[in-house]
Amino acid sequence: MKILKLEDFTIGNEEPMTLMGGVNVLESESVVMTVAEKFAKTTSNLNINWIFKGSFDKANRSSISSFRGPGLDEGLRMLEKVKSEFNTPVITDIHEPSQADSVSKVCDVIQIPAFLCRQTDLVIAAAKTKKIIQFKKPQFLSAPEMKNVIEKCRQAGNENITLCERGNSFGYNTLVSDLRALPIMPKFGFPIVCDATHSVQQPGGMGEKSGGQREFVPYLARAAIAVG
């Protein structure tokens, strides 16, 4: 099993737990810093490794009028401030190959969104940064199919990989968590992450925006921790 080194801690299925938490999309700087401060205090009290997560652009939106984020430059500025003030690694996602280099200069982990993880040019561009690359398993792929995604990254010269379970499509506007993915994907030899919040998303479930069933998040998170 691959063990990844990040700042002053390690990431691996047999290593102490790492929490990736922050905001879904970077909003105002005040919101970002308030949330980061809360995470910093809580994870410090619980002695949990923490990586701040925030997206500078949410390109995959239901409506043209939906808020997407502050954009690349402003988003990276916010992430750099969080990283500096709270001494924590940061993760964000990219949507285009051209974003990989700029993001790699600030972020410790680059995330490839679920709908984009089969985009070969994007995967290769991210891999070439040599950063840790987190692949969110698409709602339309089975756990065994993630082997193909991994191989693209490895062929580009990067084996710093994590795989993130985030639910599977179950009819219209509904995701379900197939927790069999948690013992299946480690067989590829890389650390596994569970996104308990996006796993309860209801894509497009509110017409012009997505809904969700947040009341189930704690149960999925506990189940994932129990699996290890």
What are these regions (language model features)?
Residues M1-L19, R77:
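N-terminal amphipathic alpha-helix/helix-capping segment at the start of soluble metabolic enzymes
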Residues V23-V32, W50-L72:
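Glycine-rich, proline-tolerant flexible connector loops at the mouths of alpha/beta enzymes
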Residues E37-L46, S65-I91, A126-I132, L182-C194, ...:
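Alpha-helix-loop-beta-strand connector modules within alpha/beta enzyme cores
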Residues L46, K105-V106, A156, V227:
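Structural motif
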Residues P70-G71, E85-Q99, D108-D121, I132-A143, ...:
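Catalytic beta/alpha-barrel core
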Residues M78-K81, A100, T120, I124-A127, ...:
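Active-site loop-to-helix "anion-binding N-cap" substructures in soluble metabolic enzymes
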Residues T129-G228:
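Catalytic alpha/beta core domains of metabolic enzymes, predominantly
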